[in-house]
Amino acid sequence: MTQTQGPTASALTRRIIPCLDVTAGRVVKGVNFVNLTDAGDPVEIARRYNEQGADELTFLDITATSDGRDLILPIIEQVASQVFIPLTVGGGVRQVSDVQRLLNAGADKISINSAAISNPELVRAAADYHGSQCIVVAIDARRVSSEGEAARWEVFTHGGRRATGLDAVAWARRMAAYGAGEILLTSMDRDGTKSGFDLELTRTVSDAVPVPVIASGGVGNLEHLAEGVTTGRASAVLAASIFHFGQHTVRECKAFMAQRGIDVRLD
């Protein structure tokens, strides 16, 4: 666990963030939020990414809300003991007291997703009490516009299982106004496909909100990471598959982005 909350680099430095989707105590990776494949032990994987120079780490318990489970604090405590970079934790957050419990377990930032939909005031209350710098609102968005129409994306919750009827761009604006310090934006259409970010979604939300946007969903190669911050205008890029299964290391990603003239933190 780091003692510094929020991004440690300058606002212009782009961050690379490995993501650990966790269920039943194991890191998994799926495609379009389904067909999950085991990727390993979360503590071991977290330690590896810390050693590789990741800027931050995101840990998401992807079935806590849909299963109605409590927070998996023991695993979070173990992960936090192995990393010395900002750790964002999400999944199963239902009330402000859950935010405090996760911070006490070693998290630096808390990601709120489904609970923000059912109780938007939770975001405001958590930000007022703990500070916007440690509140992240996660948005899982699916494109719902037809070909030829203006692009539209809908927010889904409960691990992508429930449609909300909410427009993703408008929701991001609202959450930023309520005090979210960052938006973690995942394209459900691109998740696990390795076909690249939904750059139109990323750029539209990045341009619409005054807080950093973390692009997520679809990274399959190094070029995709660079596109997330150049074309997509994201402040940070999040990936899982290319790291979990040994396709690239965090250092390789940073070296590639630096060669493209993108400001990244190099060890």
Swiss-Prot record:
Its EC number is 4.3.2.10. One of its GO terms (molecular function) is imidazoleglycerol-phosphate synthase activity. It is found in: Cytoplasm. CDD domains: HisF (cd04731). One of its GO terms (cellular component) is cytoplasm. Its main location: cytoplasm. Keywords: Amino-acid biosynthesis, Cytoplasm, Histidine biosynthesis, Lyase. Pathway: Amino-acid biosynthesis; L-histidine biosynthesis; L-histidine from 5-phospho-alpha-D-ribose 1-diphosphate: step 5/9. The active site is at 21, 140. One of its GO terms (biological process) is L-histidine biosynthetic process. SUPFAM superfamilies: Ribulose-phoshate binding barrel. Belongs to the HisA/HisF family. HAMAP family: HisF. IGPS catalyzes the conversion of PRFAR and glutamine to IGP, AICAR and glutamate. The HisF subunit catalyzes the cyclization activity that produces IGP and AICAR from PRFAR using the ammonia provided by the HisH subunit. This is Imidazole glycerol phosphate synthase subunit HisF. It comes from Bordetella avium (strain 197N). The lineage of its organism: Bacteria, Pseudomonadati, Pseudomonadota, Betaproteobacteria, Burkholderiales. The gene is hisF.
